[in-house]
Amino acid sequence: MNYRKFGNTGEKISALGFGCMRFPEYEKDGKMYVDQDKVDEMVAEAYRQGVNYFDTAPKYCNCNSEEAVGRAVKGFRDKVLLSTKIPLDVCKKPGDYRRALEHSLDKLGTDHLDFYHFWGINRKEFDQTIMAQDLLADAAKAKEEGLIRHISFSFHDEPLAIKYIIDESKKRGIPMESMLVQYNLLDRTNEEMLHYAASNGVGTVAMGPVGGGRLAAPTELYAKLTGKKSIATYELAFKFVLGNPDLNCALSGMQTLDMVKQNAKLASDSTGFSKEEWQQLGEAMEQLKKFSELYCTGCKYCQPCPAGIEIPKIFNMFTYYNVYGLKDHATP
């Protein structure tokens, strides 16, 4: 496994991070449960392969992810970096930040978090909730008490808002130490801000490195770009993300043991793109522009649909058929 300096946190982070929002689940008596045995196997294999960053959140996997992660890493908790998040909609009155933090600590079965993110924020929420309620001070107090080690944020907004959040936090004397943002071969809108964050000592993690699976189907794209033997677009996408010197970790939502092994192999590879190959990715972007008309990361936040429609699955089938021409794969 390759490791990278994680901003100014003092940590070394694995190039591959384990996103814990797509654990295998099963239904029993009308309720969804995480398959703990499979999760234990996947997490143990990831750890064995060198992955040291595990990212979860209170609402992942029908609110079962944090507990599942806590159980899975119990035997090596002190050797890995645990990351979770606080949804701002729970912060309505004084003390809510602390209550949410303590709830996550309890679910994860740990006495501290390595990274605690303000979850999915934008500039408006930063101003009207984080700053207005002085939640940075709550985070700083929790850090002083050893309940969290690093203050972080995940982000969904216009790229320039990243600079605003980093700068304003620093002005308050409570700097953001790491961030989690969307970044992949399909969506490079945050590329400039990744550089800004890295230049300011903020650790950087990319969510959606393969576009929610949209970049996983086979094509001849790599062969077209380089004249070399074709590789999966999935591998091309991963190498692109990990090839960015401003990016510390690619966070992958892994669902199977095979995915863990495949991703760990890619993140352990010492070979990457040459400067010329990197420049040629502009051509790749032209070919992939057709994705932009229907872009889905597979997060399933649109589920359940009131009409019972499996929206992510339909989008996935559409992509296989319309973009790749893989008719057999486009059959549910």
Show the residue positions of the predicted features:
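N-terminal binding-site loop/beta-alpha segment at the start of enzyme catalytic domains
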Residues: 1-80, 138, 144
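A general structural detector for well-ordered alpha-helical segments in enzyme core domains, enriched
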Residues: 2, 38, 42, 65-72, ...
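Conserved, mostly hydrophobic/aromatic
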Residues: 6, 18, 46, 54, ...
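A cross-family glycoside hydrolase active-site/sugar-binding cleft signature
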Residues: 16-21, 57, 83-85, 116-119, ...
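Glycine/proline-rich, positively charged
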Residues: 26-27, 34, 91-206, 222-223, ...
